[in-house]
Design a protein with these regions (language model features):
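Active-site-adjacent bridging/hinge elements
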Residues: 49-57, 79, 130-138, 163-170, ...
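Short Cys/His-rich metal-coordination motifs, predominantly Zn2+-binding knuckles/fingers
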Residues: 216, 285, 396-397, 470-472, ...
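Short secondary-structure boundary/capping segments
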Residues: 73, 106-114, 220-222, 266-267, ...
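Feature 926 captures the class I aminoacyl-tRNA synthetase adenylation module centered on the KMSKS loop
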Residues: 3, 7-9, 236, 448-523, ...
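N-terminal, positively charged nucleic-acid-binding surface of large information/translation enzymes
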Residues: 2-268, 309-344, 373-420, 446-449, ...
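Charged, glycine/proline-rich intrinsically disordered loops and linkers
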Residues: 113-146, 345-357, 481-506
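Structured ligand/cofactor/substrate-binding pocket environments in proteins
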Residues: 69-81, 89, 97-98, 186-189, ...
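Short hydrophobic alpha-helical segments that form membrane-spanning helices or hydrophobic packing faces
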Residues: 208-209, 260-262, 403-405, 462, ...
């Protein structure tokens, strides 16, 4: 039912060599070594685009350890890769490591006990402490260059561990196609993309309110936000009109009272319409602000009128921008209230009050402002305690602030309807699996409220490749950035002089200053197709792999990785980056919560692989459909292990039948004479058709279910039914027929199972075939003149006889003197075709077939006296 890789009708056979005691133990290490040595999964660049199947593999974050979720999603990708390889595709299957950005930076800080200060001189002989300090205040202070060296050193060690684990899992990656998102090639591609976007007007710098993480001291993009429910309270206090009337506001952030730039109410709210355009005075600080109208104000929220502070949240930013309000920022980038009293606070009482909060964290400042309000008896009632969603950076542990800063942005449709529509159209060039995941992509685009902020105020990452000329006073001319020559890439403006300047001119009037920021890690990770495909470096390779055939990833990063990759490919290649997107679900713990390192509920992959074996873990992973959140189930892994062991043992039985020294097993179908043999192969042909269709639809779980269901029927029923004939009891012709059916079935089943159980199938393949099953051809459905339901019917009758023996508490080999099988006329006809095998398997002298109505039943079973009673 299959052809081998040489394209011949007869697979390449070898003398049978079956071990006495087949076992799964030790297969992973031995076969991995062989695959690596033989280049089993090596991509052949001497090919055409039509022959290639290219995969944009997700690079896992190199920040300590993998978890069971990686095994789950990467295995799902691997079975798709293995199927494509077996149908004749030249599979381009790389592996990357995402080792730039905050996760690596944070791990290095804690692992070595260091923190970076760009002002610290480089120490060429620096060695990190043997034992890191327990308190971060005692960490070694190192230069940016020293810090980056430590990041690279630790990332390389982590990646070795990751590679070893993925090989143990059986990923059919070409391990010569690896990259790191911080290596020279990745930095070159990332910087070249930035410069291309800059030249096209798709990258720009702006000074504007920015979401800011006070722990990491960096700007954060919309895609990196995470809403978390936190405890808070509404405080109600008044502003005062000119005639002393109290206008009450209700806010969860009284600490921003000194930053208030206006009060705002809905234009249709009759309570406040008389106040629009008039001034009111803030309590405690005594600052006049105007009452304004805006449609975003909600009449039914709180008192219906709100403070506009610069800036409490993104709604404040919208009001500030659209109402053209003054900027009155009081929160610094360190999350503390700015020390210098702002000039808009002019009264002595107000300036004294500000001194009471200056330098405090926002949390301490809140307490101080509440005390100041209470001291003047201005708090109306008790604070109303609530739980409410607050913006956090997804990797941070403190609420985000909004501060004004100068940042770089990529245009992503957040402010451009035409671009937004174009990006949605790009999404329709991609087949999403499952299809409903497309709506998450489109909903994200539709909900964007700004362009993509790509600059970060951190140390370890891809430097933004620009410098700025300094005027006569030493001020940077941000509007006239200096860009590197193409052949200079990659560059580090903090270490490399700008073109046309020398290092002595750095930081002096009339000289230059390098941009100190790095690119957001997603700005580089979004370019994985371009990085691994050789864009701008190997155009021949790029033409063969781009657009990639497959992007596999989790559904939680559709808004980040998938979307940003579409943005980059649209801008750079004017195309979608892939043809298909396979979206994995989450792994859930026993409480049905997502497993994640941050939650502390992850399972260590090595423990699971060592206990159950890789094939068992792969079985669990591929039993789940794409997009489905799946429970971590030990029971499912046990089933997978049982399946792999059964495959070894059943294969041993088949191959040992009639085997002699140096013999080979024949799959010559011309010798088929028995109806049951033809039936099992006809049924198997249908399994091949259905499994192939499922794989073509990216439904590997369906392919596994179909194959596994047939396999158990094959081993439990067919193998039991034909044993007598297989041993020659019915003559040479019948034996030849059954041996050909067995060998053909085994050959086909090994190929069908190969993507799922790569170790067990490869082990068995080596017992009687040359080469690797993983580069053998996917089985072809060969039409055999047989009844596809015959095996099920005869198997049901056999089960009925077995049940009677079990109920009589005798061994299954006990002779049946007589029994009656009642079935419909059509089933009776089928039973006649398999009656010889049924009698032999049942050890029955006489089986009487009776045509009747209803389901098949076995009755009137008369058993011979057992030679030996079964043990209790």
């Amino acid at each position: 039912m299959a052809e081998d890789t040489q394209g011949t009708d007869t697979p390449s056979t070898a003398p049978i060599n079956v071990p006495d005691k087949p076992a799964l133990e030790g297969l992973e290490a031995a076969l991995t070594r062989r695959w690596l040595a033989e280049g089993t999964y090596k991509f052949n660049p001497d090919t055409t685009r039509e022959q290639v199947y290219s995969i944009d593999t997700p690079p896992p974050t190199a920040s300590g350890s993998l978890h069971v979720g990686h095994m789950f999603s990467f295995t799902q990708t691997d079975v798709l890769a293995r199927y494509q390889r077996m149908i004749g595709k030249n599979v381009f299957y790389p592996m990357g490591w995402d080792d730039n950005g905050l996760p690596t930076e944070r791990r290095v800080q804690n692992y070595y006990g260091v923190r970076c200060d760009p002002a610290t001189p480089y120490d060429a002989g620096y060695r990190a402490p043997a034992e890191p300090a327990k308190n971060q205040r005692d960490f070694d202070v190192v230069s940016r260059r020293n810090f980056i060296e430590l990041c690279e050193e630790l990332a390389v060690e982590d990646e070795k561990v990751f590679e070893s684990l993925f090989q143990q899992l059986g990923l059919s990656v070409d391990w010569q196609l690896t990259y790191r998102t911080i290596d020279d090639a990745s930095r070159e591609v990332s910087q070249r993309a930035f410069l291309a976007n800059l030249a096209a007007g798709d990258a720009y710098m702006a000074e504007a309110p920015t979401l800011w993480d006070i722990t990491f001291r960096t700007a954060v993009a919309q895609a990196e936000l995470e809403d978390r429910e936190v405890a808070g309270a509404y405080y109600r206090y008044p502003f005062f009109t000119e005639d002393g009337e109290k206008i009450y506001v209700e806010t969860t952030r009284p600490e921003l009272l000194a930053a208030c730039a206006a009060l705002v109410a809905n234009p249709d709210d009759e309570r406040y319409q008389p106040l629009f355009g008039k001034k009111v005075t803030s309590p405690v600080f005594g600052v006049e602000v105007e009452v304004r109208a805006h449609a975003l104000a909600k009449a039914d929220k709180g008192s219906g009128i709100a403070m506009v502070c610069t800036f409490g949240d993104l709604t404040d930013v919208t009001w500030w921008r659209e109402l053209q309000l003054p900027t009155r920022a009081i929160v610094g980038r360190d999350g503390r209230i700015i020390g210098e009293t702002p000039d808009w606070i002019t009264t002595d009482a107000g300036r004294t009050a500000y001194e009471a909060i200056a330098g405090k964290t926002v949390f301490s400042a809140k307490e101080a402002v509440v005390e100041l309000l209470a001291a003047e008896d201005l708090i109306d009632g008790e604070p109303k305690k609530i739980m409410h969603p607050v913006n956090f950076y997804e990797k941070g542990d403190k609420p985000l602030e909004v501060v004004t800063s100068r940042q770089w942005y990529y245009r992503n449709g957040g402010r451009d309807e035409e671009r937004r529509a174009r990006l949605i159209a790009r999404g329709h060039e991609i087949d999403f699996h499952p299809a409903f995941m497309r709506s998450r992509f489109e909903n994200w685009i539709s909900g964007l409220n700004g362009d993509w902020l790509v600059s970060r105020q951190r140390f370890f990452g891809v430097p933004i490749p620009v410098w700025y000329p300094l005027d006569a006073d030493g001020n940077p001319q941000y509007g006239a950035p200096i860009v590197p020559l193409d052949e200079q890439l990659p560059v580090d403006p903090a270490a490399d002089a700008a073109p046309g300047y020398d290092e002595a001119q750095r930081g002096v009037p009339g000289g230059f200053a390098g941009d100190a920021d790095i690119l957001d890690t997603w700005a580089t990770s979004s370019l994985t197709p371009q990085i691994v495909g050789g864009w701008s470096r190997d155009e021949d390779l790029f033409a063969k792999v781009f657009p990639f055939d497959l992007r596999p990833q989790g559904h939680d990063i559709i808004r980040t990785w998938l979307f940003s990759s579409v943005v980059q490919a649209d801008a750079l290649q004017h195309a979608a980056p892939w043809k298909h997107a396979a979206i994995s679900g989450w792994i859930l713990d026993p409480d049905r919560k997502k497993m994640s390192k941050s939650k502390g509920n992850v399972v260590v992959p090595t423990d699971v692989l060592d206990e159950f074996g890789s094939d068992a873990v792969r079985y669990w992973a591929t039993s789940a459909k794409l997009g489905a959140d799946t429970a971590y189930e030990i029971a499912q892994m046990k089933i997978g292990r049982r399946l792999a062991i059964k495959l070894l043992n059943a294969s041993k039985f088949v191959l040992n039948l009639g085997a002699t020294e140096n013999s080979v097993v024949s799959t010559d179908l011309s010798v088929l004479t028995n109806p049951l043999d033809r039936a099992v192969l006809a049924q198997l042909a249908e399994v091949v058709r259905q499994s192939t269709k499922a794989f073509e639809n990216y439904d590997y779980a369906r392919a596994l279910q179909i194959t596994e269901s047939f396999f158990w029927q094959f081993t439990d029923d067919y193998v039991e039914l034909i044993k007598d004939r297989a041993y020659g009891a019915a003559g040479d012709a019948e034996q030849a027929s059954v041996l050909a059916a067995l060998a053909t079935s085994l050959d086909t089943l090994l190929r069908l199972f190969a993507p799922f159980l790569p170790f067990a199938t490869e082990e068995v393949w080596g017992w009687w075939r040359n080469g690797s099953v993983h580069v053998a051809q996917w089985p072809l459905a060969v039409d055999v003149d047989g009844d596809t339901t015959l095996l099920a019917t005869v198997g049901t009758a056999l089960s009925g006889v077995r049940k009677a023996k079990s109920e009589a508490k005798v061994k299954q080999r006990t002779e049946v003197l007589s029994a009656t099988i009642t079935a419909s006329e059509s089933l009776t006809t089928q039973l006649k075709a398999g009656l010889g095998d049924l009698k032999a398997a049942s050890n029955a002298r006489e089986l009487t077939l009776v045509a009747g109505e209803g389901e098949l039943t076995v009755s009137d079973v008369v058993l011979a006296a057992p030679a030996e009673q079964p043990k209790a």
